[in-house]
UniProtKB/Swiss-Prot annotation:
Coiled coil: none annotated. One of its GO terms (cellular component) is fungal-type vacuole membrane. The lineage of its organism: Eukaryota, Fungi, Dikarya, Ascomycota, Saccharomycotina. Its main location: membrane. This is Probable transporter MCH1. Belongs to the major facilitator superfamily. It comes from the Eukaryota. It comes from Wickerhamomyces anomalus (Yeast).
Amino acid sequence: MALSSIETALTKHIRSLLQTHFSTKSLKRLACSISLISCLCAGSVLLFALFTPVLQHQLHYTQFQINIIGSFTSIGMYLPLPVLGYLADCHGPVLLSVISVLFFSPGYTLAATVVQNDWSFWYLAISFGLIGCATSALYFTALLTCAKIYPKSKGLTISAPVTCYGLSSLIGSRVLKLSCLQKNGDLDLYRCFKLFSFLYFFLGLFDWVSASVVSIERDVLLRKHEDGENTPLLTDPNQEHENNDDLVPNHKSKFLKFIKDISTYVLLFSLLLSIGPSEMYITNMGSLVKAITPNSLISDQVAIHAVFSTLSRLSLGALSDFLVTNYQISRSWLLLSIIVLGFFTQIFIATSTFVKDQYYIISALSGFSYGGLFTLYPTVIFSIWGPEIFGSAWGSFMIAPAIGSTTFGMVFGLVYDSACGVFAESTTGNCVSLVFLDQLLSIRLQCSTVTHCMEGDLDQKRSLIIINHLHYIKYIYLLILRIHLSRET
């Protein structure tokens, strides 16, 4: 399928330069390397827990206001992904790299201005919405670049950028400890945000180059198919616009089949119930550590979470390929195992099983399950619906985290403000256990959803969707009722 006119315009000069000086094999390695480096730097939003103490004590934000900012971040990260995925499939990932350049630097510049001038938290929420969208665009560019360049190794081509993205929070937590980013013993958010503004501007430009290699690869394959192996790599640019929009109708027909597949919605609902609590934990990790184990360092818990998230992303990607290739074991069983691990993690938090010096166990389990979810879900989707519409398919699934993380985050903020107290020096017991006890219901529904997605006929899947939606409505009602009762007491 030919390059679209937009993709041709964005990559024409870069393709000419790269094809003149590099072989196809070298270009693939270059693109993959740049993509992985981009992922290593892309996870600044995962450091939100390190911003929380400053927002609370210096800007005097409540936990509910902080969760509004976190919700805007999640909405910016996940809600535009269906559109970003569609644009990437039709016009190449290079378009997403351009979007990341346009959103990242202005977003962090606005955030730095808000912090410096003590503007309303709504401006900070808007800035993090832009940052969230830019993060997804940059990360999705790298993910699609690797997946489309090396489509045969599904697990590794997805787990490698996903692993680097998880590792980025570990690197970031160490970088933010530098003395130049500290002020009076606390993190200087103004300097931090300005640093990110400059970093992501140049990183987006490099990602633009790496994404252009995908266009080169597809253009070369197209010409070989049409004209044979002896067709030169460089041709008249005016010829590139002929029949350059046939990708859109072909993509549309495949995407319609994806939308009509009942398994799409079963898996989508499962994702909503799994990523929501995980994203809520990351957003509120700083406050959660303070409430449950005040003596622990937030940066250390973020680092532990990042390490085990990275190990999960790397190991599960390779393990899924190994099990499918050698033992024909479905990736869905690995996914179900990670969901069960998340179930026990919620139990441990709710019952304060590991507190004080043992809280690192909670961070490790949470990080491993979080990384596993973001590795296995896209791998399963890639395996079922293929690389042609992977951008649109995975992007459509990201509606679920946008809804789930916002819902669970708001609930946590309400419970924390009413039960824990934002400015309390210490707390007794686990004042947020209510949130995690209620989340056990969502994970239980999620396990049944994945199980029925692997087995069962079409009628069972349809009935399961209806039942699960009714349970989810009941679940939201119970949360609202319990919050109301806790405020009265």
